[in-house]
Amino acid sequence: MKHLFILLSVVLSCFSMIAQTNNNHFVGMDLSMLTKYEEHNKPYLDKDGAEIKDLLEWIPSIGVNTVRVRLFVNPTEPNAKAPEGVCQDLDYVTRLGARIKAAGLNFMLDLHYSDSWADPTNQKLPASWNDCVTVDQKAEKVYNYTSEVLNTLAKASAAPDLVQVGNEISYGIIGINVHPYDNAADNWDGFVKVLENGCKAVRENCPNAKIIIHTERSGNAEQTLYFYNKLSNLDYDIIGLSYYPFWHGYMDKLEETLTTLGNSFPNKEVQIVETAYYNSWFPSSGATYNTSTTWEASDAGQKAFIDQLVETLAKYPKVNGLCYWFPEEAGCGDDTDWNATNTATVIQNWINRGLWWPEPDAKGHWPTSALYSLGKYSTSALDNINVDFSDNRQKYNLSGQRISNPNRREVYIQNGIKKIGL
């Protein structure tokens, strides 16, 4: 009896032109601190307890095909291991980006245009840009800086596949203020001009990359719509959202925003470029919503959140990306001395949203259950291609075509099982 299997449209790191395929799901991790954890931490383990030799080489096996890395202009502590993780200068990002590309992964570059964190409350001009006073000067600086960064990365075989022009820019960028609602003091003309120059630099210097405009109002559909309506003439590809339920609300709020964006911007893709949830110790302060009553701060609760998020996003055809923020976190990074000074750690304080547990007495760090749930997003879009897998010896690519010998790192199907060529 012949068995028919539905071939899932899985997009993994083996495709060199992954960013140009229409039905891709980008399954991502923001691994901006990976280098520091590799230098100052025990190895990462898989669910069977085996040591992961190279995390970038391993993550395609669980369905991850994209890695996001932030870039600061002149980070405040480029050589420090603490306290904030603000160490990603161009040299750091170039070296990590080259590793990402060599592993066959998509590289998402997150341009902060700042010396430190750029977010809704901080969009400061880099100190070395203080001579840029007018909008025209700032726009020109963004164009030149973006071009320089992309050329440097390209020369190092680290050209990004996706580029964020700004990070969580709902309220402005490099000191030019706007709001996602009516405010008489806003400078939307100046704001858009700066973005235009950043996007222009990407198109000219990295023409195959997709451009992301990233905000964090995912829990407010009205404000999100207001913001992106202001960018109606901007040349970009993807609406990028941060979604942290403890700040942005429950899944129904996100769904309202996704529905609004899908109806209002049918020509734009949508991605959740940042999300995370607690695996322990829900904070006693700082959270807008006590979501621990829905998803407890535990291994099971973190997994339940990711499972529900993957299921939710699969309902929206314009949504094609999900990226987990800081999954490489495993405590502060020094597990030989829990009382070590800050200079001996990767970060100063535990955030407790990583996808590995800090295990001081183990041979390495064990993964949380949510790690393996994240990769499910890669299989949540179905092409419904019927393929005859009755002959166990035959191999098939992800288009349903029979192949003889898969290339190295090529994903293929044999006997109904997804495998990767060696």
Across the structure, where does each feature detected by a protein language model lie?
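Bacterial Sec-dependent N-terminal signal peptides
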Residues: 1-21, 381-382
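Boundary/entry segment of secreted carbohydrate-active catalytic domains
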Residues: 20-58
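Hydrophobic faces of well-ordered beta-strands that scaffold small-molecule active sites
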Residues: 25-31, 67-69, 107-111, 161-165, ...
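Glycoside hydrolase catalytic-domain groove-lining segments
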Residues: 52-56, 189, 204-210, 219-291, ...
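Substrate-binding cleft and catalytic face of glycoside hydrolase catalytic domains
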Residues: 58-210, 214-216
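Aromatic-rich peripheral "rim/lid" segments of glycoside hydrolase catalytic domains that contact
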Residues: 260, 280-291, 296-308, 312, ...
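Residue-level detector of functionally pivotal "anchor" positions at catalytic/ligand-binding pockets or at interdomain
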Residues: 379-402
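C-terminal tail/sorting-segment detector
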Residues: 411-422
